[in-house]
């Protein structure tokens, strides 16, 4: 039996923190948490209940001139669950933004699934129950 209640943070390294922040705020509606810490990490709230630790994506800036990632990246993708109505609207919005939207299937869960890349090249899955 698991003792874990929730995953609360996904931390992403960013060459362009501002563009990545804008992507998650505008595309997925994530909310900025706290005060700006320049330079430093940006915390974006994904979800949460008042009595619990919020679920967050943390954007950590790489030093200027870092260039391409030199080692294999361990993050395959991150996934957001949305409602079926939100899924349809989000798919339209992503295409209108000119982003490449890729389809997919989940191996275990009957669902509708799409994939898109954030400005850093991280793959983001959007999934809803079929």
Where are these regions (language model features)?
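Short aromatic/hydrophobic contact patches that present stacked aromatics
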Residues: 9-11, 43, 77-79, 113-115
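Short, conserved charged micro-motifs
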Residues: 19, 85-90
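Vicinal oxygen chelate
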Residues: 2-3, 91-130
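Helix-adjacent hinge/juxtasegments
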Residues: 59, 68-72, 76, 81
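Short glycine-enriched loop/turn motifs at secondary-structure junctions
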Residues: 3-6, 71-75, 107-108
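N-terminal beta-strand motif that seeds the catalytic metal site of vicinal oxygen chelate
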Residues: 1-18, 78
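Core segments of cupin and vicinal oxygen chelate
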Residues: 13-57
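Acetyl-CoA-dependent GNAT
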Residues: 60-65, 128-130
């Amino acid at each position: 039996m698991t003792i874990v209640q929730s995953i609360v943070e996904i931390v992403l390294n960013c060459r362009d923190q501002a563009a990545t922040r804008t992507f998650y705020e505008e595309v997925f509606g994530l909310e900025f948490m706290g005060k700006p810490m320049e330079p430093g990490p940006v915390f974006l709230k994904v979800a949460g209940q008042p009595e619990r630790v919020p679920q967050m994506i943390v954007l950590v800036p790489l030093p200027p001139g870092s260039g391409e990632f030199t080692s294999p990246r361990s993050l395959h993708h991150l996934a957001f669950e949305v409602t079926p109505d939100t899924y349809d609207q989000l798919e339209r919005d992503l295409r209108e933004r000119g982003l490449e939207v890729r389809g997919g299937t989940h191996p275990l869960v009957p669902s509708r699934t799409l994939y898109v890349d954030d400005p850093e090249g991280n793959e983001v899955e959007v999934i809803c129950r079929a």
